[in-house]
Amino acid sequence: MKALSKLKAEVGIWMTDVPAPELGHNDLLIKIRKTAICGTDMHIYNWDEWAQKTIPVPMVVGHEYVGEVVAVGQEVRGFAVGDRVSGEGHITCGHCRNCRAGRTHLCRNTIGVGVNRPGSFAEYLVIPAFNAFKLPDNIPDELAAIFDPFGNAVHTALSFDLVGEDVLITGAGPIGIMAAAVCRHVGARHVVITDVNEYRLELARKMGATRAVNVSKEKLADVMSALGMTEGFDVGLEMSGVPSAFQDMIDKMNHGGKIAMLGIPPSTMAIDWNKVIFKGLFIKGIYGREMFETWYKMASLIQSGLDLTPIITHHFHIDDFQQGFEAMGSGKSGKVILSWDK
């Protein structure tokens, strides 16, 4: 079958011909319809330090997808050939303390689809049936293909009560932008998102951000004043991994504020812990999606009218994958969809 693989320990990704995956007793075989390029895929493409330490070569990559079930393992219940599915990209062990307690998103033995095992940039994918999510008919393929990153946004944004709250989001990548849309949809008062990329700040405006602030040109304190804010933000969503952005967030949080962190900062990042302590801030780390509460919430948000379509800015056939990666790497894109349909 055709598949995009990391074949060499260098920059790039290659179209290859690999054997189709084998179906296990508890697995689904999925024929891929559409995939999306993730920031993780860009790390793998660019072969940065994280990728060099993490990705075995060769490896079929990709983990954002939608497809159709074409075969079902003999022990599987609840799925049938013809079902349209997306899937959770974190394969969990099922026997650690967190898995047994129903907190599978915190499994210490997680294996990543397209990272530690063959991924979805292929004609066919095998995953455990436990990881598949059957899609409602009224959610189109292109939205289903981005459920993985949308789930990151939903998990982060819905970590805290948002109704009537003032929210600061640092980092206007696709996940940060989708988080802004979620915050507005569920009833936040002001949703302010910061970045230095004008293209993506404009996308954030289209997706409902109250203010999209280029912090290289405008002071966040001035924006807060213009919005009539006098006490700081109630909720912070850190999506950038940029130390200066996180420090700015801590400075602008109200006393008792709550921060959810999805962005990955340098391990040596220093912050003013005095402000964390004396403001009584709550900081929560976010990894992946809650299984499967986040997935149910994603479907419900879209079915209740949340419009994610502006975040999808580019479509390519899989044969033109190189153009897709170039678009994603340009900084002038939202989500990039690769279609596997003939």
UniProtKB/Swiss-Prot annotation:
Which pathway features in its UniProt record? Amino-acid degradation; L-threonine degradation via oxydo-reductase pathway; glycine from L-threonine: step 1/2
Cofactor: binding details: Binds 2 Zn(2+) ions per subunit.
Source organism superkingdom: Bacteria
Annotated positions for site Important for catalytic activity for the proton relay mechanism but does not participate directly in the coordination of zinc atom: D148
**Which Gene Ontology molecular-function terms are recorded?**
L-threonine 3-dehydrogenase activity; zinc ion binding
Q: What is its EC number?
A: 1.1.1.103
One example of a Gene Ontology biological process annotation: L-threonine catabolic process to glycine
Spans through the membrane:
none
List the active site: T40, H43
**UniProt binding sites for Zn(2+) 1:** C38, H63, E64
Positions bound to Zn(2+) 2: C93, C96, C99, C107
**Catalytic reaction annotation:** L-threonine + NAD(+) = (2S)-2-amino-3-oxobutanoate + NADH + H(+)
- Keyword annotations: Cytoplasm, Metal-binding, NAD, Oxidoreductase, Zinc
NCBIfam families in the record = PRK05396.1, tdh
Query: Assembly state and interactors?
Result: Homotetramer.
UniProt family annotation: Belongs to the zinc-containing alcohol dehydrogenase family.
HAMAP family reported for this sequence: Thr_dehydrog
- Tell me which PANTHER family the record gives: L-THREONINE 3-DEHYDROGENASE
Q: What is this protein called?
A: L-threonine 3-dehydrogenase
